Amino acid sequence: MQAKAVARTVRIAPRKARLVIDLIRGKQVSEAVAILRHTPKAASPIIEKVLKSAVANAEHNYDMDVNKLVVTEAYVNEGPTLKRFRPRAQGRASAINKRTSHITIVVSEKKEG
């Protein structure tokens, strides 16, 4: 059985979030939380919140044992981009793309043996 949590339209660039999400894929939940707490990136607290939500979903909805949970899937997709303009010299303007992310984490119980 798998439990899933998704954070949609989070204001962090997907490229930056993927750096952090790659660190926790395949790890046990307790180890993943420890890694996120000690990773000095802006995406770390956001991903930790999604991971805790996935664990809570597993415990509440599917009666899974929290100590046996493993991060089976963790990925970041691109969300909608907010387009902004930065004024430049000579009356020109440059485009600024404020990128957003959809963060998905799936946890499941580790098989015995």
Swiss-Prot record:
NCBIfam families: rplV_bact (TIGR01044). This protein binds specifically to 23S rRNA; its binding is stimulated by other ribosomal proteins, e.g. L4, L17, and L20. It is important during the early stages of 50S assembly. It makes multiple contacts with different domains of the 23S rRNA in the assembled 50S subunit and ribosome. HAMAP family: Ribosomal_uL22_B. Keywords: Ribonucleoprotein, Ribosomal protein, RNA-binding, rRNA-binding. It comes from Anoxybacillus flavithermus (strain DSM 21510 / WK1). Belongs to the universal ribosomal protein uL22 family. The gene is rplV. SUPFAM superfamilies: Ribosomal protein L22. This is Large ribosomal subunit protein uL22. One of its GO terms (molecular function) is rRNA binding. The keyword rRNA-binding applies. The keyword NADP does not apply. Gene3D superfamilies: Ribosomal protein L22/L17 (3.90.470.10). Part of the 50S ribosomal subunit. CDD domains: Ribosomal_L22. One of its GO terms (cellular component) is cytosolic large ribosomal subunit. One of its GO terms (biological process) is translation. It holds the Pfam family Ribosomal_L22.
